[in-house]
């Protein structure tokens, strides 16, 4: 990857279908047969907690090859406070450009812009092997629990990063993925019919 061979900019309405197609191609048959992420993106844009000022696309040679979005969320602290944070994603890179540094470049740019926007911290689900390289740690190390996960269960997927140093100092509590990320699968199926047909496959490693 050459840092001069791509640009990152804000998404515009003219990009919506290209971005949804990108997400569909990137996530298809990865976590489940087919995917929901393109419909999640479609729905998030009309949610009041969606942050359009932090909805990014990465372009290379005039083609959108990556995207990332941010959504307002909160931690329910054990003392009863609601601590405003953000969550992130879907984030993806076109399959043919994965593992070449573009994903980390997009992620690091996005995090820098989210910090400048005033986000204090970020919680979301991801792989520490990738996101740890951009400053994420296990949320449990911050005293943050994942809603609905029984004590003692593996929470290594649940990650956190402070964007304002010390933002979570003295806070323990629970995080729940915003409801806007949960979509009706029959509605997602209907939405998917707007795209060219793709075969859904049950593959090893899928989690749904």
Give the label of every model feature segment.
Residues 1-14, 21:
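Conserved N-terminal entry element of GNAT/NAT acetyltransferase domains
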Residues 20, 27-69, 74-75:
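Active-site rim helix/loop that mediates acceptor-substrate recognition in acyltransferases
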Residues 54, 58, 89-92, 119, ...:
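Internal, conserved structured core segments that host functional sites
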Residues 60-62, 96, 162-167:
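Short loop segments at secondary-structure junctions
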Residues 80-95:
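Conserved acetyl-CoA binding element of GNAT-fold acetyltransferases
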Residues 88, 96-97, 101-109, 119:
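Conserved acetyl-CoA pyrophosphate-binding loop and the N-cap/start of the following alpha-helix
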Residues 116-120, 126-153:
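Conserved active-site alpha-helix within GNAT-family acetyltransferase domains
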Residues 165-208:
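Acidic/histidine-enriched, glycine/proline-rich intrinsically disordered or flexible terminal extensions
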